[in-house]
């Protein structure tokens, strides 16, 4: 039988290796001021099996609390039964503190098999607010990309191919290059009326200290 335990950031980092940057201790600590409290949790029996980082804010435990997605960090392959038990323990942890729980999983492209299992478990344990459509295409499995898209998409593709442009790989360790990339995104968001939630300084701190 497993139990849930709250750890310090250092303890958590020594045990769990994140599958993506948003589940890392470094990224979490960089954004600590965006939550009222942080909960580094380990779910284990004789072995540490599941870790999750939650930000507490406005009566809710959120994973993530300041990122596109979060979810569990798993040590090795775990059974569905253990995954279900882990979610039950997490729900009990939140209920004991009179807190709601919100978990946003990463896109399936990150780990289709494991994330499909988490989706199955979570949809049976908690309410699903929304499911994002996944538009990624695995080009390694497709011989001719143009043959799987419709006529209007092919037309747009050919138009884009006829526009002269260069692809330049920028240096993420160079503030000037990061600023250049940030400005492209900022202008795009501004022209489309979408909010930009991170300042250049926040992006630079993330890139230089975490990524």
Report the location of each language-model feature:
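A conserved beta-strand-loop-helix scaffold within acyl/acetyltransferase catalytic domains
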Residues: 2-60, 106-211
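Acyl-donor binding region in acyl/amide transferases
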Residues: 59-127
């Amino acid at each position: 039988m497993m139990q849930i335990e709250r750890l310090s950031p250092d303890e958590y980092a020594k045990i769990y290796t994140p599958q993506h940057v948003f589940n890392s201790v470094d990224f979490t600590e960089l954004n600590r001021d965006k939550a009222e409290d942080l909960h580094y949790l380990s779910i284990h029996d004789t072995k540490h099996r599941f870790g999750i980082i939650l930000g507490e804010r406005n009566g809710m435990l959120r994973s993530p609390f300041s990122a596109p997605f979060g979810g569990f960090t798993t040590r090795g392959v775990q059974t569905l039964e253990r995954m279900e038990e882990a979610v039950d323990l997490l729900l009990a942890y939140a209920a004991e503190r009179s807190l709601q729980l919100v978990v946003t999983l990463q896109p399936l492209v990150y780990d289709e098999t494991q994330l499909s299992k988490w989706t199955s478990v979570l949809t049976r344990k908690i309410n699903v607010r929304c499911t994002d459509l996944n538009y990624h295409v695995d080009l390694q499995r497709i011989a001719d990309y143009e043959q799987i898209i419709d006529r209007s998409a092919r037309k747009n593709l050919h138009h884009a191919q006829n526009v002269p442009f260069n692809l330049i790989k920028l240096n993420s360790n160079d503030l000037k290059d990061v600023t250049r990339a940030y400005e492209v995104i900022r202008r795009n968001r501004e022209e489309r009326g979408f909010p930009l939630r991170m300042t250049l300084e926040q992006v630079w701190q993330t890139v230089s200290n975490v990524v």
